[in-house]
Amino acid sequence: MVNAVSRVRRFVRGAPLTYLWLTVLLATTVIQRSVNRHHLHQFLVHDSTNIHDLATDPLAVLFESLLWIDGRSWTPYLVLFTLFLAPAERWLGQRRWLTVGLTAHVGATYLSEGWLYLAIEYRHASQHLVHTTDIGVSYFLVGVIAVLAYRIATPWRWGYLAVLIAIFGWLLIAAEDFTAIGHFSAIFIGLMFYPMARRRSAAVGSRARPDN
């Protein structure tokens, strides 16, 4: 039991940003549960990466949208962060991990909202979606999940990628909304970091190799 607790502590200490972020998300989830629906809507719209706020205060909303989860259940994020974000942080290091995740978050946000903007301009979507609620950590998460493919040896890597693309490809076809476009885009943004992942794998491998 003591050994298990010690291993958990070492794992958490090896991914401090992941678990600090989870702690913040736990706090904001408590806030979501404690306020009424009207005030919650005001909170979330204020921190949303929608077309209006990206045009008026992009840096603030791109950061603040990462502090909320899209839903009221925190436990699934604990599982997903532990399965994907924490191992990626331990492998890539904090700076590279942030680079991948934030690039996916920002890139997928602008791609999805750009698609929505065009849909509104061509009257394929309602004008009120300019102020839609768009918060959450999923683009960051999907981008990091994608780059983790480079941590997996072939041929298993291709199976991992096939499952990932199949899941979000099906959601793209079934949902046909801007968030599905964002998730699908985040996969390929994450995969663009192959050169960085390759260098990191080589560095980790050289440290693990015993001296002759």
Q: Which ranges hold each PLM region?
A:
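Central hydrophobic cores of alpha-helical transmembrane segments
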Residues: 100-107, 157-170, 186, 190
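Aromatic-anchored segments of alpha-helical transmembrane domains
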Residues: 26-31, 105-114, 163-178
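N-terminal TM1-TM2 helical hairpin plus the immediately adjacent luminal interfacial "cap"
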Residues: 33-84
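N-terminal signal-anchor transmembrane alpha helix
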Residues: 2-45
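Membrane-interface helix/loop boundary segments of multi-pass membrane proteins
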Residues: 83-101
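Loop-to-transmembrane alpha-helix initiation sites
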Residues: 175-190
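Membrane-interface micro-motifs in multi-pass membrane enzymes
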Residues: 127-147, 182
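Hydrophobic, membrane-inserted alpha-helices
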Residues: 61, 79-86, 141-147, 162-172
